[in-house]
């Protein structure tokens, strides 16, 4: 059943807020958390409706909702037009959320890949071009959040999938939704994430896809950790070249 069917469209949220304020910590932050707020197919209609309803719920002068959480379960696309349209509405989502005056949180963030025809791409079928495109999309989304939402309204980004989803998973099975592989190796997506945050990826190669001759001197693991000395065995990057010990 739906609570609003019994308590009404206004009271079911107001009651939840009252109880949370009464029994929760004094500094509790209350968010309305929902998915498809970046909806490109209806010009962010769901988010616009949600912001309207927050105003209705708060119209009693007592109810206060601190923030809006957006569940960004996205897919990158190999079609340029499709990807640009998705970007347009993600940026519009962040602008609308910021304009609401509420705290803004990316509460569930992961990303699959669609081919140019709109079909989901399995993890094993990802190409180098797809990996790099996805990394760039991660970078763009994270940096757009940081640029569009004022710092005082930023309430963070929560990554939903740490690793790629295995075959048979109940969530986006057999798709490249993680920033690490199933074996916990950093992906191109990890580098894009870090770049979006304004950081530098600490690897033996300066950026994704760059030639190793431009790599800094040193010894690195394949995961990008710098070592003081050569290990007794394994595969490492030495001055930009892979070495088997």
Where are these regions (language model features)?
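Aromatic-rich peripheral "rim/lid" segments of glycoside hydrolase catalytic domains that contact
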Residues: 1-6, 85-103, 110-209
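An active-site-proximal structural segment forming one wall of the substrate-binding cleft
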Residues: 8-23, 49-61, 133-152
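Intrinsically disordered, low-complexity coil segments
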Residues: 25-26, 44, 58-64, 78-86, ...
């Amino acid at each position: 059943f739906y609570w609003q069917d019994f308590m009404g469209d206004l009271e079911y949220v107001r009651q939840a807020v009252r109880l949370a304020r009464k029994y929760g910590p004094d500094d509790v932050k209350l968010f309305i958390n929902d998915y498809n707020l970046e909806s490109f197919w209806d010009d962010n209609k769901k988010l616009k409706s949600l912001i309207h309803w927050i105003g209705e719920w708060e119209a009693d002068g007592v109810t206060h909702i601190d923030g809006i959480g957006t569940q960004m379960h996205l897919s990158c696309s190999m079609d340029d037009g499709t990807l640009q349209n998705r970007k347009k509405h993600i940026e519009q989502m962040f602008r609308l959320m910021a304009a609401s005056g509420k705290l803004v949180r990316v509460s569930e963030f992961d990303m699959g890949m669609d081919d140019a025809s709109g079909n989901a791409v399995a993890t094993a079928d990802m190409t180098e071009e797809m990996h790099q495109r996805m990394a760039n999309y991660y970078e763009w989304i994270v940096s757009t959040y940081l640029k569009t939402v004022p710092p005082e309204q930023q309430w963070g980004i929560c990554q939903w999938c740490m690793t790629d989803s295995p075959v048979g998973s109940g969530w986006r099975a057999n798709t490249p939704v993680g920033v690490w592989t199933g074996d916990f190796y950093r992906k191109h997506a990890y580098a894009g994430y870090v770049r979006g945050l304004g950081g530098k990826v600490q690897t033996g190669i300066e950026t994704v896809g760059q030639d190793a001759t431009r790599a800094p001197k040193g010894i690195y693991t394949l995961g990008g950790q710098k070592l003081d000395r050569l290990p007794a065995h394994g595969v490492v990057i030495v001055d930009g070249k892979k070495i088997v010990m």
